[in-house]
Amino acid sequence: MIRIRVMNNVKLSPTEVERINQRIEKARLYNDLAEAFLEAGDETEGAGLGLVMSLMMLKNDGLSASSYKIESQGNNTSVIIDIPLNISKENLQLQKTQDILKNIDGLPTFPKSIQDIQTMISKPNSSINQIAEVIKKDVALSANILKLANSAAFIRANKVESLDRAIQLIGLKELSQLLYSLGTKQILEGKFPAFLSIWEKSNQCAFYCKLIASRINLPKDTISNLVSAALLHDIGEIILLSLEEKTMNNIGKISASKEIASAVSMEEAALGITHTKVGSLIAEKWNFPDLYSKSMEFHHRPLIVEEEFISYIYPIYLADMMIKINNEEAKFSEIPEKILQFCKFEHSGEFHSFRTKALESF
C-alpha cells in the first residue's frame, strides 16, 4: 500500500471535525456529485464541495471511502490517502464512464465524401464550379452549407440562395475547414438529442469569435480556422448532455449558482470524464487537426494551452464567457487578465459594451 499524507499545523475545532465526518459519511451515499449538491443545505464553506469532489474522484478511480481520512492530533491536521498496490481493473471507471466511451467507440467514421471534397479543394487546379457540382450530389451537405452561409457568422446584406454563391462567399480555404463541423453535424444531429441546443450556442460562439478576431486583427486564415474551431469546441458536451442529461443539467445549475467549482471539475467527479475529454477523443477518432482537438480540450483551461494555439483558444474562451455572462451564469471578474489583454479589453466597461453590441447583432 502507498500512503500519502499532507499535514497542516492548524488544529480543527470539534465543530469542524463533526462537519467533515458528516460530509464523508454523506459522500458515500451519493451516486454523483450533482446529487450531492442538490441535497446540500449548508452553504458555509461550500457545504464541503472540495471534500465531496475528492471522495467522488477517488471512487471513480476504484478507491473505497475508507481510503480517505482526515485526522486531527494536537495542533496538527493530516489528510491521508491510502492507495492499494493492486486495484482491480473493472473498478477503474464508473459504469457511466464506460457507457460514454462505448458511445464514442460506436460513432461512425468521418464521412469519406467530405474527406474527398477537402482533398479536391486542396488541389490548385480545382474550381468553385467543379467543387459545387460534387457537393450538389450530397443534398444534406448542400443544405447545411447554405444554412451556414446565411448564419450569423457569415451574415450578408442579402440572403444567399445558390450553393455556388455560398461557396464563393465563404471561400474555398474556409470551406475546407468548415467541412469538419458540417461532417460532425451530419453524424451527431440525428443521434444525440442535445445537438440542436449546443449547435446554436456554438454558432453564437463562432459569431463572437469572428468579432473578437476582427478586433485584434488576426490574419484571415487564422479567422477561418477560429470560426471552425468555435463551431466544434463543444461537441463533447453534446454527447454528455444527451447521455447524462439530468446530471449535466444539475451540474450546470450548481456551478452557476454556487460559484464554487467549475462545471468541468464537477463532470470529472460525477461522471469520471469531462466533455472536454470526450471532445478530444472524438477528434482523435476522426483524425481532426490538432487545432480542433486542442480547442475541445482546453477551452475551459485556456491558460495552460501551448502558445501556438492561443490565438484560437483565448477568443473561444472569451466568447463562451460572454455567452455565460449574458445568461447570468458567470461574472466578468472570473476572466483572467491575460486573456482580456490579449483580446484588447482594458476595462470592464469596454468589455460589456462589446458584449452587448455582439448580443444585439447575433
Predicted regions and their residues:
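C-terminal beta-strand of the catalytic ATP-binding
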Residues: 8, 81-92
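Conserved alpha-helical "signature site"
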Residues: 89-234, 238-247, 263-275, 281-293, ...
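Conserved glycine-/histidine-rich ATP-lid loop and adjacent helix of the Bergerat-fold HATPase_c
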Residues: 46-67, 71
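Post-HEXXH active-site segment of zinc metalloproteases
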Residues: 244-258
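Terminal helices and disordered tails flanking the catalytic cores of nucleotide-processing hydrolases
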Residues: 330-362
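Charge-biased C-terminal accessory regions appended to nucleic-acid-, cytoskeletal NTPase
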Residues: 251-252, 277-278, 306, 344-345
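Glycine-rich nucleotide-binding loop
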Residues: 72-80
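Glycine-rich/acidic phosphate-handling loop/turn and adjacent ATP-lid/helix
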Residues: 1-49
